Each structure stands twice: as structure tokens, then as C-alpha cells.
């Protein structure tokens, strides 16, 4: 896989072009690509469910952030926050459009819970506990997160909050669905407490 296959990385690159001259942006991007490949080489043979997160989201963020931070520490966080925010807000807009279709709000939480169990379960490096799982309320706590794990492993725990914020952008403004969260692992909490109410 190459860095530009990640939608997050492409968004980071667009943010870089806004901040840096073209030649410097290109140079940073090339260095980030090399850093990304190194991360892949250091973490071979990951299960597909884990790789879906590391290759698309986690490793691109680490590679871009550390590359920029080495020369421009004040701009590195800005690139990640703005770039990830753009992608996550688009995801939120897609969910919002979906929920406007007749009947979708009635089944959304049940379908969403299946997606959580499959894409954010033990096979993907997460641990979670479901508290409530009905058609009107979905509540679960994440107690282990690969985003936190890999950011800590590569000495950049300060970027974990960006992934947490992505959830707020994606789920925080949905019609008919209220998203509540009071803490995250990435911001010092005991868990990531997700609660959706219809």
C-alpha cells in the first residue's frame, strides 16, 4: 500500500499545500511516504481487521505528523486536526443524508451496532463492552484501542485526541440520533463511552 491510498493522507496533503510552499510540501510528502512505508515494514502480517485501521488511518497520521513535526512542530498538529476533521465531517454528512430516508432511523442503531462489533471488535485490536443494544439506544464502552496503542508505541500520544474528535464530527450532528460521550482513552479517560439515543 502507498500513502496516497488513504483518504486521510490525501486530506493531510491538501492541508500541507495550504501551509507550505509547493516545493516544501512536496518534500515533506515524500518524507512522509517513506515514514509510512517504514511503519508498514515494522508491522508486517497484521490481521486484515487491524490493517484496515492502521493502513488507512493510524499509520498515515503518525507518518505525516512526525515528518512535519521534525521541522515544523507548530504546524504538524494543525495539518492533522484540519485534515482528519475534513474527512470525518464528510462521513457525518453521509450518515445524515442516510438518516433522512424513510424508515432508516428505525433500524440505524441496530445496523450500526453490527458494524461496531465487526469493524471495531477484538479482531481489529479493540476491546469493548456493550451496555445497551436496542433499536432506540446503543451504548458501549471501548476499553482497548489500537489508535491509542500505536500512537503510544511510536511516541506520539498527543495525536490520539484527533481520532477521538473524528467520532464527534461523524456522529455529533445526526438527525434523529443523539450522540453522547463523556470520556475517551485518548484524552485520559478510563474508556471511550459511546452512547447513541433515538
Report each predicted region and the residues it spans.
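Hydrophobic, Leu/Ile/Phe/Ala-enriched alpha-helical segments that form helix-helix packing faces
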Residues: 16, 68, 120, 167-170, ...
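Charge-dense, low-complexity intrinsically disordered segments
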Residues: 3, 51, 74, 154, ...
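C-terminal non-catalytic interaction appendages of large macromolecular assemblies
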Residues: 136-198
Amino acid at each position: 500500500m502507498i500513502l496516497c491510498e488513504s483518504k486521510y493522507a490525501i486530506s493531510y496533503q491538501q492541508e500541507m499545500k495550504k501551509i507550505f510552499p509547493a516545493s516544501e510540501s512536496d518534500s515533506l510528502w515524500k518524507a512522509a511516504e517513506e515514514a509510512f512505508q517504514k511503519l508498514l515494514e515494522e508491522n508486517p502480517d497484521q490481521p486484515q481487521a487491524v490493517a484496515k485501521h492502521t493502513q488507512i488511518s493510524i499509520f498515515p497520521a503518525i507518518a505525516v505528523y512526525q515528518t512535519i513535526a521534525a521541522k515544523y512542530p507548530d504546524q504538524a498538529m494543525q495539518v492533522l486536526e484540519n485534515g482528519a476533521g475534513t474527512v470525518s465531517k464528510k462521513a457525518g454528512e453521509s450518515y445524515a443524508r442516510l438518516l433522512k430516508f424513510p424508515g432508516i432511523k428505525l433500524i440505524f442503531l441496530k445496523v450500526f451496532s453490527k458494524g461496531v462489533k465487526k469493524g471495531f471488535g477484538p479482531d481489529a485490536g479493540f476491546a469493548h463492552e456493550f451496555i445497551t443494544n436496542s433499536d432506540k439506544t446503543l451504548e458501549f464502552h471501548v476499553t482497548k484501542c489500537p489508535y491509542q496503542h500505536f500512537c503510544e508505541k511510536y511516541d506520539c500520544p498527543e495525536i490520539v485526541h484527533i481520532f477521538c474528535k473524528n467520532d464527534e464530527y461523524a456522529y455529533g450532528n445526526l438527525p434523529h440520533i443523539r450522540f453522547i460521550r463523556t470520556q475517551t482513552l485518548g484524552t485520559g479517560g478510563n474508556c471511550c463511552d459511546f452512547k447513541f439515543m433515538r
